[in-house]
Structure formats: C-alpha cells, structure tokens
Amino acid sequence: METKNILHDIAKRCDGDIYLGVVGPVRSGKSSFIKRFMEMAVIPYIEDKDAKLRAIDELPQSGKGKMIMTVEPKFIPNQAVEMLMDENFKVNVRLVDCVGYVIEGAKGYQDDQGIRYVKTPWYLESIPFDQAAKVGTKKVIQDHSTIGIVITSDGSICDIPGAVSYTHLRAHE
C-alpha cells in the first residue's frame, strides 16, 4: 500500500488528525528528529506567517552530551498544523515528544541524594524521575499518538558507553 493511501486511511479514521508520537531511550535523538522533521516536512507548508513563527518557536531544544534535555511530554507544535496532501485530502499534523526511558550514564535524572522526585499531572505525590519518564512515554503512545515512531541509538551520538546493550537488556525485562 502506498504511503499516501495509508495516511489517508489513518486520517479518515481519526477525523483528519495525525499525531506522531516519538519515543525511545533518553539521549537517542528524539527531539533532534522532531526538530528536523518539522523543519523539512511541516513548517515549509504553514501558510500563515504568525503560525509559522509560532511553530518555529515551539521546536524542542536539542543538544549533545549526556544531559537529558526533555523533561516532560510536549506537543509540537502546540496546535496541530493543517496540511494539504492533495486536492481532496487535508490532515492536521503534530508531533509528541517525550522524555523517554532513562538509561544508565544519562545525566539529569539524579541529584546528590539519588534519583530525583518530580511532580506529574498523573499522581498526587512526587514520583521518581525514571518512573515519571516511563509513565509519560507510555501515555504518549497509548493516549496521544496516531502513529508511533521509535528512535534508538548505538550510543555514539550521546557519548554514553554501552547505551545500546543497556537499552536492549531493559527492553527485554
């Protein structure tokens, strides 16, 4: 089946909304993927000047190294962008970024006392950062995505030795 036909079928079943949930381990390039996808496949097709500038401002931060950059799920752009796929086919597109599953060697989820505790919209009390990241990632896929995209890495882009083997082992737990 052709990609356009698949998207058309999905959009038909979802009232024209196609939300791409981007998940995977922390520091694997999820935010970088979203930023690049938006720059190449979405922003050029936004006709309204103010909406285009707003979408650019809403792009996620990305960076090199071991520090976790995304600390909560985020819809990008905040409001879905209507895109004309052909004469009779419009879709509303937005991506959903998430923290991702914590991997050993990543920085930012622990402090001097151990794993940081954070407040989330899903629990009344604070929970461990890694648990919040796991819950948020699961919610992105189960509750907010039409299509799920899994980003993985061999660890070479984030300077975390053994990122693949650790992530691979955790995935099988």
Language model region names:
Residues E2-V118:
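Conserved G1/Walker A P-loop phosphate-binding module
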Residues Q79-M85, R94-V96, K134-V140, I149-G155, ...:
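P-loop NTPase catalytic core
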Residues G100-V102, D154-I157:
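Conserved nucleotide-binding/hydrolysis micro-motifs of P-loop NTPases
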Residues D111-S156:
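Inter-motif core of Ras-like GTPase G domains
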Residues E2-T3, C14, F129-A133, S165-Y166:
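Short secondary-structure boundary/capping elements
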Residues T167-E173:
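Conserved small/polar residues in nucleotide/adenosyl-binding loops
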Residues G29-K30, I157-D159:
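Flexible loop/turn segments at secondary-structure boundaries
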Residues G105-A106, D159-A163:
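Conserved ATPase-coupling elements of RecA-like P-loop NTPase cores
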